[in-house]
Swiss-Prot record:
Self-association and partners: Heteromultimeric protein consisting of LacA and LacB.
UniProt keyword terms in alphabetical order: Isomerase, Lactose metabolism
UniProt catalytic activity: aldehydo-D-galactose 6-phosphate = keto-D-tagatose 6-phosphate
Protein name as annotated: Galactose-6-phosphate isomerase subunit LacB
Similarity comment text for this entry: Belongs to the LacAB/RpiB family.
Pathway in which this enzyme or protein is active: Carbohydrate metabolism; D-galactose 6-phosphate degradation; D-tagatose 6-phosphate from D-galactose 6-phosphate: step 1/1
Taxonomic source organism: Clostridium perfringens (strain 13 / Type A)
InterPro entries reported for this sequence: LacB (IPR004784), RpiB_LacA_LacB (IPR003500), RpiB_LacA_LacB_sf (IPR036569)
A GO molecular-function annotation: ribose-5-phosphate isomerase activity
């Protein structure tokens, strides 16, 4: 399995540690940068990770910036990417099992590198649970990648809200 990994200059040391961890576990790592502490911008590297995963060059991706918010927003702009910003295993596993997330994002100044490595390993090992409900919500999310008239309809997500109100979703 090949994992694409990218970061901004704030967390290059964390990315290197995570990359070393993944390599030690036997994963191929595609490091898309940045490679030093020279000021740069996280969208560049979020986009690179997203493109590597969306094209099939990598199976999964890891994005890291200071808070994780910026790089995760950037990677999610790449069509075909479903990235989750996480800082715990429960969220990471949920993202993979229910939403078939293919990228995971972290705040390198928020989540310690050892916890990050444990979360990444759990994310990699988790399997997407393919069922009609999960496929339906993923299709709805994916449909947002293209600008379609029905997205402007204030009732676009009503079906899911109605199901929530009926108690069909459990937290």
């Amino acid at each position: 399995m090949k994992i694409a990994i990218g970061c901004d200059h704030i967390v290059t040391d964390t990315k290197i540690a995570v990359s070393d961890f993944l390599k030690a576990k036997g994963y191929d790592v595609l490091d898309v940068g940045t490679y030093d502490f020279t000021r740069t911008h996280y969208p560049i590297f979020g986009k690179k990770v997203g493109e590597a995963v969306a094209s099939g060059e990598a199976d999964l991706g890891v994005c890291i910036c200071g808070t994780g918010v910026g790089i995760n927003n950037a990677v999610n702009k790449v069509p075909g990417i479903r990235s989750a910003l996480v800082r715990d295993m429960t969220t990471a596993i949920y993202a993979k099992e229910q939403l078939n997330a293919n990228v995971i994002g972290f705040g390198g100044k928020i989540t310690g590198e050892f916890l990050m490595c444990d979360i990444i390993e759990a994310f990699i090992k988790a399997d997407y649970i393919e069922n009609e409900e999960n496929k339906k919500i993923i299709n709805k999310i994916n449909s947002l990648e293209e600008n379609k008239p029905e997205q402007n309809d204030i009732h676009f997500f009503d079906e899911f809200l109605e199901r929530w109100n009926r108690g069909e979703y459990k937290d």
